[in-house]
UniProtKB/Swiss-Prot annotation:
PANTHER family on file: 39S RIBOSOMAL PROTEIN L10, MITOCHONDRIAL
NCBIfam families: PRK00099.1-1
GO-annotated biological processes: translation
Protein name: Large ribosomal subunit protein uL10
Length: 162
């Protein structure tokens, strides 16, 4: 890789990491190409980006993005997204399906370096859409109960009139 290519990779990763709220670092040693493609498809479906890059280049990109110092070693694949949950969920789901070959090492969530347990904890949280659905359901409960009560009152009045 030439110096120019390295610079382009660093610039790309710096921009991506600055705009993302979660970066997950995983060990992918032993995964086949087909399994990696499955991970990429799953990530794309969840608005998460995936890339394998040299540890030294990622370390420089993380420093340039002012996300702290992260120590990287071994074979790493990086997943990132513009929300805190989706990258963690994709990594956790794939790690569960490929326990022997894929493991979450660490992550950077909202600018703070996190260990694997914190990444797993974020993966267990409901997504934004799920939370909005729960909130809408809670808001609709009283309205639904009120309409059921009105309907029962209407039926009672009709029975009394008949």
């Amino acid at each position: 890789m030439t110096r120019e290519e390295k610079s382009q990779v660093i610039d790309f990763l710096t921009a991506e990491f600055k705009s993302s709220l979660a970066v997950v670092v995983c060990d992918y040693k032993g995964l086949t190409h087909k399994e990696l493609e499955t991970l990429r498809k799953e990530a794309k479906a969840n608005n998460t980006k995936v890339q394998v890059a040299k540890n030294t280049l990622v370390t420089v990109a993380v420093k340039n993005a002012e996300l702290g110092d992260i120590e990287l070693s071994g074979t790493n694949i990086f997943l990132w997204s513009d929300d805190q949950i989706s990258a963690c969920k994709v990594a956790d789901k794939f790690a569960s399906a490929n326990k022997e070959k894929f493991a979450i090492k660490s992550g950077i969530i909202e600018g703070q370096i996190s260990d694997a347990s914190k990444v797993n904890a974020f993966a267990k949280l409901p997504s934004r859409e799920e939370l909005l659905g729960m909130l809408a359901s809670v808001w609709m409960g009283p309205v639904r109960n009120f309409t059921i009560g009105l309907d029962a009152l209407r039926r009672k009045k009709e029975e009394e009139a008949a």
